[in-house]
Amino acid sequence: MTFAELVDRVGSKGPFQLLHTVLLGLPILGMANHNLLQIFTAPTPAHHCRPPPNASAGPWVLPTGLNGKPETCLRFVYPPNASLPNDTRGATEPCLDGWIYNIVDRDSIVTEWDLVCSSSKLKEMAQSVFMAGILVGGLVLGALSDRFGRKPILIFSYLLLGASGSGAAFSPTFSIYAVFRFLCGFSISGISLSTAILNVEWVSTRFRAIKSIAVGFFYTFGQFILPGLAYAIPQWRWLQLTVSVPFLTFFLLSWWLPESIRWMVLSGKSSKALKTLRQVAIFNGKKEEGEKLSLEELKLNLQKEISLAKARHGIADLFRTPVLRRVTLCLSLAWFATGFAYYSLAMGVEEFGVNLYVLQLIFGGVDVPAKFITMLSISYLGRHITEGIVLLLAGGCILALIFVPLDLMTLRTVLAVFGKGCLSGSFSCLFLYTSELYPTVIRQTGMGASNLWARVGSMTAPLVKITGELQPFIPNIIFGTIALLGGSAALFLPETLNRPLPETIEDIETWSLRAKEPKPEPEAEKSSQRIPLQPCEPGPGPS
């Protein structure tokens, strides 16, 4: 009996699983708000230099740019030099007295701390700091999760996100705000890692994909909620606080969640694991089945996993053989390209000149059909074809934005939305594809290393946007080219459709060699080719 069959005995699709999914999914919904929060807490409104004290705002104070609008980062020197001829343009200087912002409906960290002109890089830096927190959190909390358990790390991460998110709302300076945002990203890694493991443990094998997709849709719905919250709460501090406080509630509710049964058995806590299984059986109305379970049966069902856990494998094993080297390098590039390009579009909503709230709803909504189409494609066309196509299409859309004039806002928006949908599909495909390509003995290591590259990409994306100050088209060239390279690399990966999962490193080597061998002609087909033709009996005519 396998562990999945053991879960079936205590109930794998009962009320416990429903409540378990909701309790894990609601924080994921809130996590989407934090990931995309800077879209609404850091928009840059139209602005120009504040005139010097006691000076009128005449044309000699605010120089006019080529577009006929006031310069955003320069003003005329005051008082003007009277010795200059009338046709001479006056000398200019930076905005020494601050800026005037065209604030229509909301404030932001940009308007509060003047993150414009020479300080505009700090806005992108804030998002990179947040992504760096996710990167560091994945490295630190992943290791702590293996040592102390999934549940303690999840509980700690809920508390840390609620506290650090609330702290960011009360930050007196940008530096303190950045520190709290780093901690927010750090805690988000703990939530996503622990949720991914706990989510699929309490269902049978055939329902794992459904439960995984169900929790994934909580993130999509979170993208719908954020624009509504931002529209109702125009003050960035209150918005930051609103999306953070619920995690203090999740912290209290998470004590009800059970620890990973596998982790408890592998950590020598089999008695506690058995007690948890019996509690789940009672909750699902299968008390008698729960009482029949024994410690010996539980250990026997997890004997294989216990043996695999004793074998030590590390990052170096991802490069041990030629096939694994190819898989690791191609997957790393695909993950990096996806995270890199995804956040370039997701965080660039305000660049398309469309209503910020409406466009974010569209950006969130495109994930629904994108994930559905991706699931159909990977089930029929295969994994590497699907992954290659969606990344190539995304790269093409980003590069096409270079050639579309700024006044064609509808076309630019369509390209961006389509590209973002392709990248969302790429994430969905990669999570499944990566788990199928790596053998069981290094699967968790491979997943962690691959996901790390997505975090590096998402952390780098805001910094690349700064190159737009040199030429507006440079960021899109970089984002689009990397996406094309990632899509091309995916095409060199072996196909996993309808193949059993490899258990050992030797399995994937043998598996790859078999894929290169010509398929033998089925015996039934050979026989059918040798069947002699027989005369057909005339059938009955129409009555």
UniProtKB/Swiss-Prot annotation:
Tissue: Expressed in kidney.
Transmembrane segments annotated in the record for this chain: 22-42, 125-145, 152-172, 182-202, 213-233, 238-258, 329-349, 356-376, 389-409, 413-433, 473-493
Molecular-function GO terms, alphabetical: antiporter activity; organic anion transmembrane transporter activity; xenobiotic transmembrane transporter activity
One of the protein's GO biological processes: response to toxic substance
Sorted UniProt keywords: Cell membrane, Detoxification, Glycoprotein, Ion transport, Lipid transport, Membrane, Transmembrane, Transmembrane helix, Transport
Gene3D superfamilies in UniProt: MFS general substrate transporter like domains
Biased composition range(s): Basic and acidic residues: 514-528
Domain of life of the source: Eukaryota
Parts of the chain on the Extracellular side: 43-124, 173-181, 234-237, 350-355, 410-412, 494-543
InterPro entries: MFS_dom, MFS_sugar_transport-like, MFS_trans_sf, Orgcat_transp/SVOP, Sugar_transporter_CS
Localization per Swiss-Prot or TrEMBL: Basolateral cell membrane
Residues linked to a glycan: N81
Cellular component annotations (GO), alphabetically ordered: basolateral plasma membrane
Catalytic activity: estrone 3-sulfate(out) + glutarate(in) = estrone 3-sulfate(in) + glutarate(out); estrone 3-sulfate(in) + 2-oxoglutarate(out) = estrone 3-sulfate(out) + 2-oxoglutarate(in); glutarate(in) + 2-oxoglutarate(out) = glutarate(out) + 2-oxoglutarate(in); urate(in) + 2-oxoglutarate(out) = urate(out) + 2-oxoglutarate(in)
A Pfam short name: Sugar_tr
Family to which this protein belongs: Belongs to the major facilitator (TC 2.A.1) superfamily. Organic cation transporter (TC 2.A.1.19) family.
Functional description taken from the UniProt entry: Functions as an organic anion/dicarboxylate exchanger that couples organic anion uptake indirectly to the sodium gradient. Transports organic anions such as estrone 3-sulfate (E1S) and urate in exchange for dicarboxylates such as glutarate or ketoglutarate (2-oxoglutarate). Plays an important role in the excretion of endogenous and exogenous organic anions, especially from the kidney and the brain. E1S transport is pH- and chloride-dependent and may also involve E1S/cGMP exchange.
Protein name: Organic anion transporter 3
Species, as recorded: Sus scrofa
Gene from which the chain derives: SLC22A8
